[in-house]
């Protein structure tokens, strides 16, 4: 490693080159999150519900997690989104407009015992799903 009086240029260049060994830096610099993410880097996205699906939880849990298949309005991609809350799936019908967000797993991926589900439903027809489940709001008729 250069450490002389006039070594600043080489030190800087070496640092720039070695940064690419850090996988987090390389992914960020190449913009891979925006390229692979269905929401294209946005915090939330709107979509139309195509169907309700039940997804089996991974071992050792035994449950059918209630999810929906959503087609995003911005790019037409289809994703699976989890419906959090007891009986939340009953407030969601096909062709409803839902707002989805990341489910909050590590590195922007799936969370808990739900494999391949990276998103959760936050709103149905503009009303918060949590409010609907609690009974604080009514679902508007579209």
From Swiss-Prot:
Residues 1-38 are annotated as: Disordered. One of its GO terms (molecular function) is structural constituent of ribosome. Residues 7-16 have a biased composition (Basic residues). SUPFAM superfamilies: Nucleic acid-binding proteins (SSF50249). Keywords: Ribonucleoprotein, Ribosomal protein, RNA-binding, rRNA-binding. Signal peptide: none annotated. PROSITE patterns: RIBOSOMAL_S12. Transmembrane segments: none annotated. InterPro entries: NA-bd_OB-fold, Ribosomal_uS12, Ribosomal_uS12_arc, Ribosomal_uS12_euk/arc. GO terms for cellular component: small ribosomal subunit. Residues 17-38 have a biased composition (Basic and acidic residues). GO terms for biological process: translation. Belongs to the universal ribosomal protein uS12 family. With S4 and S5 plays an important role in translational accuracy. Located at the interface of the 30S and 50S subunits. Part of the 30S ribosomal subunit. This is Small ribosomal subunit protein uS12. The gene is rps12.
């Amino acid at each position: 490693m250069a450490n002389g009086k006039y070594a600043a240029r080489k030190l800087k260049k070496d640092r720039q080159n070695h940064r690419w060994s850090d996988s987090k830096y390389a992914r960020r610099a190449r913009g891979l999150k925006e390229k692979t993410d269905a929401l294209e880097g946005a915090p939330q996205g709107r979509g139309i519900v195509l169907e309700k699906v039940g997804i089996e939880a991974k071992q050792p849990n035994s449950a059918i997690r209630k999810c929906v298949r959503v087609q995003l309005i911005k790019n037409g991609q289809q994703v699976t989104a989890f419906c959090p809350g007891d009986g939340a799936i009953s407030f969601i019908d096909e062709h409803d407009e839902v707002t989805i967000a990341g489910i909050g797993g590590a590195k922007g991926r799936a969370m808990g015992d739900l494999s391949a589900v990276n998103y959760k439903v936050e709103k149905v027809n503009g009303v918060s799903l949590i409010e609907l489940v609690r009974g604080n709001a009514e679902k508007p008729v579209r």
